[in-house]
A protein has these predicted regions:
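Residue-level signal for inorganic ion chemistry
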Residues: 41, 127, 158, 216
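Conserved SAM/SAH cofactor-binding pocket of Class I
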Residues: 44-137
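Mobile active-site "lid"/loop adjacent to the S-adenosyl-L-methionine
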Residues: 128-157
């Protein structure tokens, strides 16, 4: 942690190593810490030299920070509606000296295109809430509920705003749950974001998939490539080699 900018890290927060470029991230275990889905999305998304990328619902900024480490993108923006999470993301950006490459913005996904403008990004990424509406909510709309359930925005909001902000031929990357694939594809096509690439994620080789990684192309032609399955665990507690590589271990 040498040569890091001095930023405030509160007593309820922690610093987690990201194993990429010596980067670290500030998180609050009492709120919502990033999971494997965000890391896998950062390994699936492609940001080319000179491209600008936007992460919708960035949380503590994990996806922009990892994409900055892994790609040659020109600039990365993270949009987050919860001020506390956005503040942690901004401090992580400063801690890693990434202020010139990453911008964190506090705001609502439903108003994103009005804020950033039409055709303003070549790439949009998102790790959105998976659960529909109020289904399964046991408590008030706290940080964890907002991250997991479509309380403040839904899939339609994300795709509508993404379609406006993507340049023609721009790429949309999302991690979601397989049980919603029919709805996802239907809404993507409705907003002229053509599904182009998909990879199912399996916890074990003999289990059903529990995540799906999707790439869409703004204004693309109809042709979907289904990539080989991504298996997470070789055995309980032991990742497959590809997972270790994605994490940077």
């Amino acid at each position: 942690m040498e040569n890091k900018t001095e930023v405030t890290i509160h007593s309820h927060e922690r610093l987690d190593e990201l194993h990429r470029n010596g980067y670290w991230i500030i998180q609050d275990p009492g709120r919502f810490c990033f999971g494997m889905d965000a890391v896998l999305l950062s390994g699936f998304a492609k940001v080319k030299p000179g491209e600008r990328a936007l992460d919708l619902g960035t949380g503590t900024g994990i996806i922009p920070i990892l994409l900055e480490a892994k790609t040659k993108g020109e600039h990365f923006t993270g949009l987050e509606i919860q001020p506390e999470s956005a503040d942690m993301a901004s401090r992580s950006v400063a801690y890693n000296h990434l202020e010139e490459k990453i911008t964190i913005v506090t705001g609502d996904i439903k108003e994103a295109s009005a804020r950033f403008g039409a055709g303003s990004f070549e790439v949009i990424t998102t790790n959105p809430p998976y659960m529909i509406g109020q289904h399964g909510i046991q408590n008030d709309a706290n940080a964890k509920t907002i991250a997991r359930h479509e309380v403040l925005c839904d899939l339609d909001d994300i795709l509508r705003e993404s379609a406006k902000m993507l340049k023609q031929g721009g790429r949309f990357y999302m991690v979601h749950r397989p049980f919603r694939l029919a709805e996802i594809f239907s809404k993507m096509v409705a907003y002229h974001i053509e599904p182009k690439r998909m990879r199912l994620v399996y916890p074990f080789v003999n289990k059903e998939p529990n995540m799906v990684l999707i790439e869409g192309l703004r204004g693309g032609k109809s042709r979907l490539t289904v990539e080989k399955p991504l298996i997470v665990y070789k055995e309980p507690g032991v990742y497959m080699p590809e997972i270790y590589d994605i994490y940077g271990y």
